[in-house]
Amino acid sequence: MTSETSPDLAAALAAGTLVLDGGLSNQLETAGHDLGDALWSARLLAERPEAVTEAHLAYFTAGADVVITASYQATFEGFARRGIGRERAAALIASSVDLARDAVRRARARGVARPLWVAASAGPYGAMLADGSEYRGRYGLTAGELERFHRPRLEVLAAARPDVLALETVPDADEARAPSVVLLRGVAAGSFVGAESFVP
C-alpha cells in the first residue's frame, strides 16, 4: 500500500525516524471542534470532512511525516446507532483515507516535498462501545466474534489504499490476535501493519 508520491513506509522506517502527527483529535479540538461524542472524530467524517483534511494538512505543514486517519471510532456499529446504513458507513470509513490523501495533495501544493504517508486507524472493540473499555479489554467475546467485528472495517480501510493500517490501543492479546487473523487471511495482502497495544 504505497503512496504514488512516497517511498515504501517500511523501508523509510528501517532507514530512520519518522514524525507521526500529534493526534488528530488534538488538532481538531484546537480548531474549535467539539469531539464529545460516541463517534469522537469520526463524527466529522459525516458532518465536517473539510475540518479533518485541514487538521491533517496542519500536521503535514508543521513537519509530520505520517498522519493517522479519523477512523479510530469509525465502525459500522457506531454509525448504525446514528441511523447510518452500512453502505453509507462504508463510504464514510473509506473517506477517512481519502481526506488524508487530499491533505497530502494540498501539502504538495504548498511546497512540502518530503515523503508523506497516511496511516488508516482501526481502534479496538472497546472504542466502538465508547465507554473507556478500550483501555481494559475483557469484553467477554470470543476470538471469532472479535474477528467478525474487525473484518468489515479492515476490508474497507485496506481497499482505500492507505500506506499502513494502524491498529491502535489494542488492550490485550486476545483482541490483538483477531485483526491479525483477518489480515493474515488476505484482507490487506501486501500492506504494512503497525500496532500499538496497551495492557493494564
Residue ranges and their predicted role:
Residues 1-200:
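Domain-level signal for soluble alpha/beta catalytic cores
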